[in-house]
Amino acid sequence: MIFGYARVSTDDQNLSLQIDALTHYGIDKLFQEKVTGAKKDRPQLEEMINLLREGDSVVIYKLDRISRSTKHLIELSELFEELSVNFISIQDNVDTSTSMGRFFFRVMASLAELERDIIIERTNSGLKAARVRGKKGGRPSKGKLSIDLALKMYDSKEYSIRQILDASKLSKTTFYRYLNKRNA
């Protein structure tokens, strides 16, 4: 099945040009919406994706009509590849059923992987530099006073667990972790 997807960003824009091009291409089913590209909630796109099966094709007028960012476009292309769905952009001359179209998207996927690796390297470098400066990652410790208070309240058997947690500002998990550690 050949699915067409058309989108405009504002109410002032018109879907006619896209719909005409998609109809001329020979789509079987059209999905259209009027939402900004930055908006994550795109029900028509989601509905189309849920209907996709192996061997189907997704046809768009231009790449910027389906994707709000390069990252999102790469995510979609990876999804289409996983589903064995062809992806065609009429204006951009992209067709993943051809070797050049597949190459184009593999380059995009490689760039996405490179970007992810760079982010990981930067994060690890930042954490290492922080450790060298004496900074410690993770959540701040709950403090001995809170823990001691909670355990004393528990030992008194005068308070419910809820009252102990509220007074000590400890989570249930943290409280029981310290209680079990003490009783071990």
Swiss-Prot record:
UniProt-annotated catalytic positions: 9
GO terms classed as biological process: DNA integration
Disulfide-bonded cysteines: none
SUPFAM superfamilies: Resolvase-like (SSF53041)
Transmembrane segments: none
Domain Resolvase/invertase-type recombinase catalytic stretches: 1-134
Pfam families from the UniProt entry: HTH_7, Resolvase
GO MF terms, alphabetically ordered: DNA binding; DNA strand exchange activity
InterPro entries linked to this entry: Recombinase_CS (IPR006118), Resolv_N (IPR006119), Resolvase-like_N_sf (IPR036162), Resolvase_HTH_dom (IPR006120), SSR_resolvase (IPR050639)
This protein's UniProt keywords: DNA integration, DNA recombination, DNA-binding, Plasmid, Transposable element
Source organism, top-level taxon: Bacteria
DNA-binding region: 161-180
CDD domains for this protein: SR_ResInv
Function field: Resolvase catalyzes the resolution (a site-specific recombination) of the cointegrated replicon to yield the final transposition products.
Family in the record: Belongs to the site-specific recombinase resolvase family.
PANTHER family per the UniProt record, alphabetical: DNA-INVERTASE FROM LAMBDOID PROPHAGE, SERINE RECOMBINASE PINE-RELATED
Name the UniProt record assigns to this protein: Transposon Tn917 resolvase
